[in-house]
Amino acid sequence: MGRASVFENRKWVPLFAGSAALSWACAFPLIKLGLADFGIAGTDTGGKALFAGARFLLAGLVVLAVAKLCGRSFAVPRGKTRWQLVLFGLVNTALHYFFFYLGVSNSPGGRASILDSLGTFLLILAAAVVFREKLTLRSIFGCLLGFSGIVLINLGSTAGQFTLSGDGMLLCSSVCAMAGGLLTRVVTRKMDPLVATGHSLALGGALLIPAGLLMGAHPVGVRLQGLL
């Protein structure tokens, strides 16, 4: 019997989960710093799409390189799975992060992180419908508590007025994140999860780059500091 992966060891789950949460929290200020580093204005939609595309294309290639070094299988079943992988990249990366970058750049960081968390609650509910997963009292209570927090934040006196360019884009991002989460379950049943993630990031980034150029983005000198 083969040795279990460290990722399957329950003792390490809190560490990995905490690291993932911390990394995701850092995304909000780092995106703002990156946009500022490249001089991308708040109204420059094309520039934001180009910036996001460059970052995700680079991230996807790095993930695929790691997968190769780890000896992961790159086999992609023919037929429907390949189209599902393309849809995965379009929804989970291209559309999700197009809306996400627009929203984050036009919304306060703390508020953006709270609105973005809506995707998690939507995914729990959607998975119960699509995959017939049982909703426990704990998960229902968690969703209600989370939704209540989002509503209170947006109704609070310090929240400011709802904006389509900020809050609206983040809500669209959350819906795409929910759809991407469902597609993740479908695609990773038929191919390696790490390889699927790498393909999704690279493909989504490759779609965002020409989209940004078509929207009038003007490429500037690439700086690794800004991309990171």
Where are these regions (language model features)?
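Glycine-/small-residue-enriched transmembrane alpha-helix faces in small-molecule transporters
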Residues: 1-53, 159-186, 206-210
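Cytoplasmic-side transmembrane-helix entry/capping segments in multi-pass membrane proteins
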Residues: 13, 17-18, 79-87, 135-147, ...
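Specific transmembrane alpha-helical segments of multi-pass solute transporters/efflux pumps
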Residues: 23, 64, 68-112, 116, ...
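Hydrophobic/aromatic residues within transmembrane alpha-helices
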Residues: 34, 51, 103, 108, ...
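Structural motif at transmembrane-helix junctions in multi-pass transporters
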Residues: 38-50, 98-116, 192-194
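Hydrophobic transmembrane alpha-helices of multi-pass small-molecule transport proteins
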Residues: 63, 125-126, 135-156, 174-175, ...
